[in-house]
From Swiss-Prot:
Native organism: Homo sapiens
Domain (Gla): residue spans on this chain: 52-98
GO molecular function list: calcium ion binding; serine-type endopeptidase activity; WW domain binding
Protein's name in the database: Transmembrane gamma-carboxyglutamic acid protein 4
Principal subcellular localisation of the protein: endoplasmic reticulum
Cytoplasmic-facing ranges: 135-226
4-carboxyglutamate PTM positions: 72
Transmembrane segments: 114-134
Motif (PPXY motif): 204-207
Function, in words: May control axon guidance across the CNS. Prevents the delivery of ROBO1 at the cell surface and down-regulates its expression.
Signal sequence region: 1-17
Lineage, opening ranks: Eukaryota, Metazoa, Chordata, Craniata, Vertebrata
Subunit text: Interacts (via cytoplasmic domain) with WW domain-containing proteins MAGI1, MAGI3, NEDD4, NEDD4L, WWTR1/TAZ and YAP1.
Summary of the tissues where the protein is detected: Widely expressed with highest levels in kidney.
Length: 226
């Protein structure tokens, strides 16, 4: 409730603070003439112009009067930095604050966005370099495969070597195949010594244990009777 009373007490002060809002009947007659403007002024106001300070670095591009105050709105400090002289700054600021920014006769001409153009060209160049490197790598890989076609064939042939060897009859008669280990069985002690050429090898030790109860049976081979 107290807040509402405070707001109601502030209404007269607010109405006195905006005297231009109260228009008389005479001022309402010329309201249409003040609101609408000509076609040329409207087109000039809505027309898009490329500013010099758009998309570039002001550290490398020094500012001047055309850039700071004509192409854009500047303040007194920026104007003083441009003119350096206090008298010239005051004279310019009096005219600038009254008339606003003014453009030259050639100010309406379209400007070229140099930085945007350079950015597009640099991006296109980077893409071309990347695609060129990829194409070079693919060409080198393909050429290496064409120059060495035997390596893969030898590798495949080594993997799939047949285990069955076919020989001609005369070769088999001259050099018969050695018997396999499964057919020949285990070699005897003398054969093992002869194969390894280790004659100094002592015979295996006797079996530890009692041999009195064992008998040696000799099998005699007899020819069958006719």
């Amino acid at each position: 409730m107290f807040t509402l009373l405070v707001l109601l007490s502030q209404l007269p002060t607010v109405t006195l603070g905006f005297p231009h809002c109260a228009r008389g009947p005479k001022a309402s007659k010329h309201a249409g003439e003040e609101v609408f403007t000509s076609k040329e002024e409207a087109n000039f106001f809505i027309h898009r112009r490329l500013l010099y300070n758009r998309f570039d670095l002001e550290l490398f591009t020094p500012g001047n009067l055309e850039r700071e105050c004509n192409e854009e709105l500047c303040n007194y400090e920026e104007a003083r930095e441009i003119f350096v002289d206090e008298d010239k700054t005051i004279a310019f600021w009096q005219e600038y604050s009254a008339k606003g920014p003014t453009t030259k006769s050639d100010g309406n001409r379209e400007k070229i966005d140099v930085m945007g153009l350079l950015t597009g060209l640099i991006a296109a160049g980077v893409f071309l370099v990347i695609f060129g490197l990829l194409g070079y790598y693919l060409c080198i890989t393909k050429c290496n495969r064409l120059q060495h076609p035997c390596s893969s064939a030898v590798y495949e042939r080594g993997r799939h070597t047949p285990s069955i060897i076919f020989r001609r009859p005369e070769e088999a008669a001259l050099s018969p195949l050695p018997p396999s280990v499964e057919d020949a069985g285990l070699p005897s002690y003398e054969q093992a010594v002869a194969l390894t050429r280790k004659h100094s090898v002592s015979p295996p030790p006797p079996y530890p244990g009692h041999t009195k109860g064992f008998r040696v049976f000799k099998k005699s081979m007899s020819l069958p009777s006719h």
